[in-house]
Amino acid sequence: MAMRTKILIGRRRALAALGALPLARLAAAVDIEQQRTGGPYVPTPQVVVDEMLRMAKVGAGDFVIDLGSGDGIIVLTAAQKHKARGFGVDIDPELVKLSNNEAKKRGLADRAAFHVMDVHKTDLSKASVLTLYLLPGMMLDLRQKVFSELKPGTRVVSHDYSFGDEWLPDDQYTWDVPEKEKVNGVPRATVYLWIIPAKVAGRWRLDLAAPASSRYDLTLKQRFQSLEGTAAGGGTKPVRLTHSRLTGEDITFALPAAGDYHLFKGKVSGEKMEGGVQLAGGKGVARWTATRVKS
């Protein structure tokens, strides 16, 4: 996978026109263009590829999509070492041709393919793993698309650049990679991991089974994997959820009760949630279910 610079004729003409600008304005304009297109082609070291796939726990059942695939190394490695399937997209026809030829050479053409395509127009819905190595501006441009199109539980891994402060990674790892110094002057790499959370924002009706036997109306607000909300039940004033968290389809939150709190853990499945709750005051456990209230 690699950061990309668009090489189509229209872009070449645009960059040629930039030549008439003063040096400072030219540098700023080129930087904006690289942020928009993802950046120049920079090969990803094999050691970084291996770490990205390790953090994503890629296996034989996975479908990997690589945005800005460059020489194809991530999808090729996923197919060869981990028996996964997938495809990469890039706007450089020559790199796409090179990647497809390499897939054929390695006997991987039935599991690894590469396409000339704009990352913004790529259908991400098949991915169980998404990989990226794009400049910060492009990462921010793609953030909402990634969140909206990928299924809950999909793993997203990025080399060096994140989705910004609003969507913090679920995990990250930084280590020394001396061979990178020759490329960008920095002998280190950082790999970020996100697990796409279920979409739970809205109103829910929660039923708590015996021995607690009660009903709550939940109102949830979500910003990526961050969750907050309120619960009302039994004629009492709404109380705020605490200890709330989304990790893929897993949801955790707590509700104040009798000077303590009920701790809920469960799974989200579309319009329903269910799981177990540790009751306040050590009074045992109970099952709970919740159904989305349609407006």
Which stretches of residues belong to each language-model region?
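Conserved class I S-adenosyl-L-methionine
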Residues: 61-68
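S-adenosyl-L-methionine
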Residues: 100-122
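Central antiparallel beta-sheet cores of small beta-barrel/beta-sandwich binding domains
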Residues: 198-295
